[in-house]
């Protein structure tokens, strides 16, 4: 095997290991729920997300101010979350003021996985760099 082939094999291996680590840490870190996210065309898409809880409320974060589904949230928006195998309806509110709270709760709950994913994402998901908008969920 020549030098170029070895470099290609190493690069492909690094990409595969990176992908497996990212997926493994996000799925196996702790509780993962399924957000049934509304799409522009009226359909729904199932998205796996982390969820945190405090004071009888829950928060998820998946999307920024340009995300269609975030823009659609209003005072009476309902979201469907599949949690512990059960579909549960929540009132959903874009909650920019809870950004730091969400990240602190996420670090508490997901610990090592949260730290490692932050490293693998080169700091893009850290509290300081994240542009995501937390969504507060209140049980109906």
Q: Which residues fall in each region the model found?
A:
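N-terminal Lys/Arg-rich, disordered targeting/topogenic segments
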Residues: 1-2
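Short beta-strand segments
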Residues: 30-65, 79-82, 89-95
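Short secondary-structure boundary/capping segments
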Residues: 25, 50, 125-127
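Covalent nucleotidyltransferase core used to form phosphodiester bonds in nucleic acids
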Residues: 23-24, 60, 70
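Hydrophobic membrane-insertion alpha-helices, especially the h-region
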Residues: 5-23
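Aromatic-capped interface at the extracytoplasmic side
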Residues: 17-37
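Short, structured beta-strand-loop surface elements
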Residues: 44, 66-140
């Amino acid at each position: 095997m020549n030098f170029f082939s070895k470099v290609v094999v190493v690069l492909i291996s690094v990409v595969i290991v990176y992908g497996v680590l990212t997926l493994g840490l996000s799925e196996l870190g702790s509780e993962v729920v399924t957000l049934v996210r509304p799409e522009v065309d009226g359909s729904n898409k199932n998205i796996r997300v982390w969820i945190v809880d405090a004071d009888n409320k829950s928060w998820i974060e998946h999307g920024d101010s340009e995300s269609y589904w975030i823009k659609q949230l209003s005072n009476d928006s309902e979201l469907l979350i599949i949690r512990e195998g059960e579909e549960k309806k929540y009132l959903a509110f874009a909650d920019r003021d809870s950004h730091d709270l969400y990240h602190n709760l996420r670090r508490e709950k997901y610990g090592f996985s949260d730290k490692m994913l932050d490293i693998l994402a080169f700091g893009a998901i850290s509290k300081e760099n994240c542009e995501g908008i937390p969504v507060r969920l209140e049980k109906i």
